[in-house]
Amino acid sequence: MTEHTLEVLQFSRIREIIASYCVTDEGKEFCLKKNPDTDIKKIEEEKKLGIDFLSLLRAYKAPPIKYRPPVLPFLEGIEVEGAALDIEGVYSVGLLALSVFSLHEWLSPFLENEDLNENSIVSFVKKIPDMLHLKNLVFSFIDENGELQDLPSLRAIKNKIRSIEDDIDKTMRNYFTNDATRQMLQSNLPTVKDGRQVIAVRSNFKGRIPGIIHEYSQSGQTFYLEPEEIVLKNNDLIAAHAEYERELLRLLQDLTSQIAEHTENIKEACEAITKLDCVAAASRWAHSNNCVFAGSIDLGLSHSIDKDGSHDSKGTPLAFYLHQARHPLLGKSAVPIDLKLSKDDRVLIITGPNTGGKTVSLKTAALFALINQTGWPVPAGPLTRLPYFDFIACDIGDEQSMDQSLSTFSAHMKNVSEIIRRAGDKSLIILDELGSGTDPQEGCAIAMAVLDDLLEKKAFVFVTTHHGALKNYGYSKESCVNASVEFNQNTLSPTYRILMGVPGESHAVDIAKRNGLPEHIIEKAHTYLGNNRADVSDLIKGLIQKHEDLNEFELQKKEEELKLKEDRRRSDLKELQLKQKELELKKDGIKRLDLFFEEKRKFLENLVRELREGELSREKTLSVKKWIDDFEKDLDKEHEALKLEQTKIDERLHSSKEKNKAPQNPELREGTRVIIKSLNRNGELIREEKKGKWLVAVDNLKLTIAEDDIEVCENQEKLKLSKPIVSIISDTSAPSSRPSFELRLLGMRAEEAQKALQDQMDLALVHGITEFAIIHGKGHGILQELSHDFLKRSPYVKAFRFAKPEEGGSGKTIVSLG
């Protein structure tokens, strides 16, 4: 990455923003020096740290990083014999040791949980050297405010100093209280000169008090006298202070020599906490600004390293995808854009009006690549996927060089020449207004030749232009894609949205009109443009309208599909509940029959015993016959009661199935008017292609449609729209009819996880389970976000939370239903 590219894209401002989230001065300095990397392993490790820190941050379990003054400057020369740190230096070392101690305290609960041990931040903190001994050593010398402890060897000297000071104060008070001397003094308080206590005496009393004169006032009216009886005491005080300083120096030297033994650990810990502070800053920025860590795409394999989101809606593998990307320096005014290139595409040509957002889109793409390769998150949607480039270069804006006397065009060509020289198949090249600044025909020819060369090198190229020929170039090359910035024809202003696959217009005349150019000039301009240009303009407008219609149709189709799925799910759930009711009824019936037979068995045993023990009489014979008749009647009653309950269940099941069953098509034949259910469009059968497939004319299109997606129109004379019909599709591949108390999503794709969550919710409701767990892991957070979004939308969820560290931590979510 060249300094020119970093400067043009204002990467230094990104560093400043993230550095502002740092806690330590060393962390800020580290952030401000960070540059994009090309070592994929290092970038992935950095991103993994950020992802895991963000996960802990969202779970309110982030490691503590405390402010502390820089330590490294104090370590210079520390290992020299006799070296002594001052109190400030000792305090800085102590605060570092205290920071490490706090991190290791935070680490303790994580070490007891194997799942949390996989978190890269936990592993990172584990590697920071233990500094408990150093912490205890330093804080036995000073307290946590940086003040000296009450050390025994210093305490004796301080007591001696205090005793001498008390003696001096007592002697001095005599001068201020004695009537004979008090009138000689200029002040009733002693003062200090050169570290010795003196009294201020009026000059006219000179010689009246024996002692040493230290100084005269400027006016000469006062002199400062050290009384004779104080001289020796002052000497003793100065000597005591010197003794104190010598002892303090000895203690500091001894402490410093012990600290020096930990120099390597101090440096290692300092480096680790500095890096952790930078990682934490990027994660806090991500948390505050809805940023994500972009998924990774390996250009060598042309697929996503993490698999998720590596294909577009049509299943085409992607090589570059910005999803709802917002330029980080535009704040809330940034309009989210989507940019994508499939694995076979290499050049994106963006056209459209000035001030429409073309250049901002280019800068966003390039800046995101730089941020991503620094290991930092980007302000975008969760589907964002970026490859790793070994060279990122741009030619943007007015590159005119005044000091080299180069024109705008010359400056551009000089820059482009250097870019072409260095470009390769893992390069990202940004070219703004390629071929401008000179004759349009020649500029356009140069632009196409440059793109030919970059295409041959298989470089990724994002280019903006006003040249109409470059739009045609985009359609004539297989690896090129046209795009445009949207323009609102009603307001005559840009919307700043990117339309993929559609070329744009400059709209110069429309913009001129909006900015007040007189109407007669506007009309004249249209005349000069000519009809051919107007026809092309209308064609492009038509394409844009078709593009919008298609997007609207796709959105409508998705909404209908979601409604179908929800209706189908509700119906399946209802049927499942009925089946559960049927099962409960059968269990209840079996229980009732068991009780019934047990009661009759006991009665029969008693009857047999009576017959054995007594003589057979007519009364006993009649009694047995009566019992048998009663038994048969009771048995018939039980059977009828169960049969009636079963009939009710069967009727409800049948009603549910009939309500949701799609009517069978009558005999299909050529010319029959039909409704395509999945498209909600009318059509006419042309012919049967093969068994179960028909060729259908829909508007101006001919489509091959599956027979089960076709419904015959009731009125064959007039086509009409029909609402889609919900049908129940039984899932024979369902793994279980019972919910799991611990649903594992690890290794699933997004669609599989979504279905597993829905099945779990349905089964939990049917079986009356009020709490279960979801194991989604940490990773890039995709499965975690998907699970939490699902739970937020579900009306059956009472609450959900991350598991406690001892339960599994942030890789697991506990769900309560209510």
From Swiss-Prot:
- So where does ATP get bound? G352, P353, N354, T355, G356, G357, K358, T359
TM regions (residue ranges): none
Q: Name a biological process GO annotation.
A: negative regulation of DNA recombination
Domain Smr span(s) in chain numbering:
743-818
EC annotation from Swiss-Prot or TrEMBL: 3.1.-.-, 3.6.4.-
For this protein, the record's PANTHER family field holds: OS10G0509000 PROTEIN, OS10G0509000 PROTEIN-RELATED
State the name under which the record lists this protein. Endonuclease MutS2
The organism named in the record is: Treponema denticola (strain ATCC 35405 / DSM 14222 / CIP 103919 / JCM 8153 / KCTC 15104)
- What taxonomic classification does the UniProt entry list for its organism? Bacteria, Pseudomonadati, Spirochaetota, Spirochaetia, Spirochaetales
